[in-house]
């Protein structure tokens, strides 16, 4: 009776060749702005930011097909999103929101820490003895 296991293991080269021929498993995400992004299936759940908008790679943004070769449902959307300013009568001088300046002082939640030079020598002796 022949053994069920081969005498030599299968060649790793053959497995590598087959892996190269396999299609890369990736998923397409069509965004509201009209852009399409592909990501590897191993990256699912990490999310990304595109044009200042954070997108999660979960089930809500997947491409929805009508049939085998038809376009996604929202592909024919002409606008690039809603208009931000509805009232055009208000003048807009600066469209960039100012950011708070960085300070060199201590944060308000942390008190000022004393300098290590001001600590008494007896403290260090007691600490390391």
Swiss-Prot record:
Highest taxon above the source species: Viruses
Motif (Nuclear localization signal): 13-28
Record's comment on post-translational modification: Phosphorylated at Ser-109 by A.thaliana KIN10.
Transactivation: region residues: 115-129
Location, primary (coarse class): host cell
Region (Disordered): 1-20, 73-118
GO-annotated molecular function: DNA binding; structural molecule activity; zinc ion binding
Similarity-based family: Belongs to the geminiviridae transcriptional activator protein family.
Function field: Strong activator of the late viral genes promoters. Enhances the expression of the capsid protein and nuclear shuttle protein. Acts as a suppressor of RNA-mediated gene silencing, also known as post-transcriptional gene silencing (PTGS), a mechanism of plant viral defense that limits the accumulation of viral RNAs. Suppresses the host RNA silencing by inhibiting adenosine kinase 2 (ADK2), a kinase involved in a general methylation pathway.
Entry remark concerning the domains of this protein: The zinc finger and the transactivation region are involved in PTGS suppression.
Quaternary assembly: Monomer. Homodimer. Homooligomer. Self-interaction correlates with nuclear localization and efficient activation of transcription. Monomers suppress local silencing by interacting with and inactivating host adenosine kinase 2 (ADK2) in the cytoplasm. Interacts with and inhibits host SNF1 kinase.
Protein name in UniProt: Transcriptional activator protein
């Amino acid at each position: 009776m022949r053994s069920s296991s081969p005498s030599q293991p299968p060649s790793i080269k053959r497995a590598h060749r087959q892996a190269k021929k396999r299609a890369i498993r990736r998923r397409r995400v069509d965004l509201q702005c009209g852009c399409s992004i592909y990501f590897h299936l191993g990256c699912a759940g990490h999310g990304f930011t595109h044009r200042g908008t954070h997108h999660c790679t979960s089930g809500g943004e997947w491409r929805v097909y009508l049939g085998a070769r038809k376009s996604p449902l929202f592909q024919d959307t002409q606008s690039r999103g809603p208009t931000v300013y509805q009232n055009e009568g208000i003048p807009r001088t600066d469209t960039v929101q100012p950011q708070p300046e960085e300070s060199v002082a201590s944060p308000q939640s942390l008190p000022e820490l004393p300098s290590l030079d001001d600590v008494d020598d007896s403290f260090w002796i007691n600490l390391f003895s």
